[in-house]
Regions:
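Soluble periplasmic/extracytoplasmic beta-strand elements of cell-envelope proteins
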Residues: 52-56, 76-80, 88-92, 108, ...
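A glycine-centered beta-loop-beta connector
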Residues: 82-87, 175, 231-237
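N-terminal targeting leaders that route proteins to membranes or the secretory/organellar pathways
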Residues: 1-65, 71-72, 272-276
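A conserved glycine-rich beta-strand in the N-terminal activation segment of trypsin-fold
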Residues: 39-41, 62-92, 191-193, 228, ...
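Catalytic-histidine neighborhood of serine endopeptidases
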Residues: 82-146, 244
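C-terminal cap/linker of serine protease catalytic domains
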Residues: 32-33, 40-43, 104-128, 238-276
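Serine endopeptidase catalytic core focused on the charge-relay Asp
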Residues: 129-201, 233-234, 243, 255
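Active-site region of chymotrypsin-like
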Residues: 49-51, 55-63, 157-163, 190-275
Length: 276
């Protein structure tokens, strides 16, 4: 009887320990990554962050006796090219996908130094309404999209000077340090550090199970609003475009998913063919 009691206690202790680790480990790891990669993060903030953009959708819908305008929470993108006053940026295709049950969609871009509506109000800006506020920002032109890679190339006009980033020459490898710069969960210009967690590319099916993406995993913390953002290596070159993330049972971030730079390069090659 005593032996059975000891075994039960041991099992309970093991399960409790596992539960504690499951709860706290996902919270500790990002903090460790941020602390150990402070210099890398500061380099991104100083020399690359102005290439980060926020993409906001305004959707218009008209009913029998009413009309409405909805403003999205926003997503991310990264500037990769400039021609005159026109900037070209990469993002995820699902970020700019247009809803079918609306009458009109307008997609605008905020540069890294442009304020969100709530931040503008907090700094004493005039309350002209959220839709009117975002309408003053440049509207995007969709240059090229691909369902098979969930990538999109967009462009917008601006007189401001923003950083233009390049694609990395080498494919990211398991254990490589990377940094994400994005606009997660209502925040702006957040840089997080992590590592590539894939030893090889793996296939991911979209929710419709119609499209498979060959992606890489990474541990840089992201959230809603990070879709379309850039993953950078220590040379501040783009090694991937972030698509989404995975959570555990406690809704804590576990890992991110990104399209690697070789597929991004192939995507841009397809675009070049369409304009040549």
């Amino acid at each position: 009887m005593q032996m059975k009691t000891k075994i039960k206690k041991t099992i309970i202790i093991i399960l409790a320990s596992f539960a504690i680790i499951s709860i706290f480990l996902p919270s500790i790891k990002p903090l460790y990554n941020q602390t150990m990669n402070r210099e890398f993060i500061e380099n991104v903030e100083s020399n690359a962050l102005s290439a980060n953009i926020k993409i906001v959708q305004l959707t218009y819908k008209t009913g029998v006796n009413s009309s409405s305008i909805a403003v999205s929470a926003g997503a991310s993108g990264v500037i990769i090219r400039k021609e005159g006053n026109r900037y070209f940026a990469l993002t995820a295709n699902h970020v700019i996908s247009v809803l079918e049950d609306v009458d009109k969609t307008q997609i605008v871009v905020l540069g890294y130094d442009d304020l969100d509506f709530k931040d503008s109000l907090n700094k004493g800006g005039e309350d002209i309404g959220i839709a009117n506020y975002y309408m003053k920002f440049p509207e995007i032109t969709v240059e090229y999209t691909s369902n098979k890679s969930d990538l999109a190339l967009i462009s917008f006009m601006s007189d401001k000077a923003y950083t233009v980033l390049s694609l990395a020459e080498d494919i990211p490898k398991y254990g490589d340090k990377i940094a994400s710069m994005s606009n997660p969960h209502g925040k702006r210009n957040i840089v997080t550090a992590g590592k590539i967690g894939s030893k090889k590319f793996w296939d991911y099916e979209d929710e419709s199970e119609k499209v498979k993406y060959s992606i890489i995993r990474h541990s840089a913390v992201t959230s809603e609003g990070s879709s379309g953002s850039a993953l950078l290596n220590e040379d501040l070159d783009i090694v991937g475009i972030h698509l989404g993330g995975n959570e555990n049972l406690f809704h804590q971030y576990v890992s991110g998913m990104a399209i690697p730079n070789d597929q991004v390069r192939a995507f841009l090659g397809e675009w070049i063919k369409t304009i040549s």
